[in-house]
Amino acid sequence: MKFFYNICIVGCGGTGGNFAARLSQFLSTSESKAEVILIDGDYVEESNISRQPFISGELLLNKAVALAAAIEDTYAYEVKAYPHYLNNIEDLGNAWKVFSYSSEYIYVDNEKRKLVNILVGCCDNHRCRQVMEKFFDKNSSLIYLDAANEFSEGEIVIGIRMNNRLLAPSRKFYFPEVMRSRGKRKSEESCGAVNIHHPQHLATNCFAANILLTIIANLITEQKIDGGMVIFDTFQYSCLFRKYKEDEHLGQ
């Protein structure tokens, strides 16, 4: 069976922007079939340029729109932009409607393919994560990758739901405080304020982006993915995968 991948990237900053560029380069030379949507309501600010994939000529442009245009210019690969914040699950549902295909099985170039939906969270806001967590719970089949990092350390959680069965849990299983956060939504907080509260490093963002690319590339080329959590520390040159085991739920 051949596959078609709907890949939705939420957040086009340091991790999401670098991941989107690497993913598009990979897909542009791959025989695989996929469609990519970038979601971000932020606009490019001067403070973004040091560690995010933007240039001074893109100041004040929407990040998703600017990144989509840059990717098409660089790799001749078209991605779609959804230049809005995700304040609730309906917002993410509306973004998902931008994808060309939604049926479980589709025909592309006269070939039958199974549709695989992938949500990649690259935001630094728990309120946005709450939206993605609810979307993951609501969908019968969805692969949900969520990346988070500080200056050097971080983790990527791989949640998998297939045919109404939870094969691997999402971030809230490991970090339940995510769902309790009542902080500002991203639409209520400037990117500059976020940078002050959560300082990050270009190398760390690129490290996280490369891990995300490895996970997706392995899925697309080998049809293999394991649920669990990747824990990394950029400046200790370390990366460890903790595979999810079903008996972990028994301890909850």
Enumerate the predicted regions with their spans:
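Glycine-rich adenosine-cofactor-binding loop
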Residues: F3-E31, I37-E45
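Active-site catalytic pocket residues across diverse enzymes, especially alpha/beta-hydrolases
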Residues: L23-L27, P53, F136, I220
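Hydrophobic pocket-lining residues within nucleotide cofactor-binding pockets
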Residues: I49, L86, N149
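A structured beta-alpha segment of the ubiquitous adenosine-cofactor-binding alpha/beta core
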Residues: L59-L115, C123-R127
